[in-house]
């Protein structure tokens, strides 16, 4: 990944600093301190002690350096997960969308992953139980990506994978579109949001849901190749549509911060 885009909202972000939330961040923007460079160049920031400012200056300089070399794991460690969406623009080219199918049960009650779908904007691929799905193959498939996009993955997909495949690592920032939508007061599952934003699905799987995916797997276990193909198409649509939805929600979240208005006029 090359240097980040100049308009990326991450460089307007102060909520990555300990003790600064969205409210104080907006207060800082109102003082015409809009970027990390603005902050570090200011001799003082109202409401922040000189000692604290020196600490923040060091942290922002470090963040700037890590961003310039594309070290996304650094930001996964220092930022609250609910703010990981702010990194989407800079790491989109290194992002991978992930969606899993299961047999319908939790891991501690006989549950297991049937399919893991991965899409990076260029290629969709699948890891399938009994064929090529292992902790090693999943780690290899995730290797090199800098950013994770899921729908409800923070609560379901990632914990399920971690419980099912010890040794699998998710150390990169995670943009969970379900919680991003809720932040925007848009409720509902993935299919509802796709309909809301006009995102189309392949006709052969239109109307299918997670329970249908469970039933399809039952047929796959019996050797039904048509069911296997349908299950993979269903997962492919789930996974590929995440990137389209991420584009939409990122822009809405960015607009909701008000930063564009602050940048446009340089004031409140």
Predicted regions and their residues:
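N-terminal accessory regions of nucleic-acid-interacting proteins
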Residues: 1-92
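Acidic active-site catalytic centers that drive phospho-/nucleotidyl reactions
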Residues: 99-101, 157, 176, 238
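Active-site catalytic pocket residues across diverse enzymes, especially alpha/beta-hydrolases
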Residues: 32, 165, 249
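Conserved RNase H-like, two-metal-ion catalytic cores of nucleic-acid enzymes
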Residues: 76-147
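Short amphipathic alpha-helical segments
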Residues: 109-110, 161-163, 247
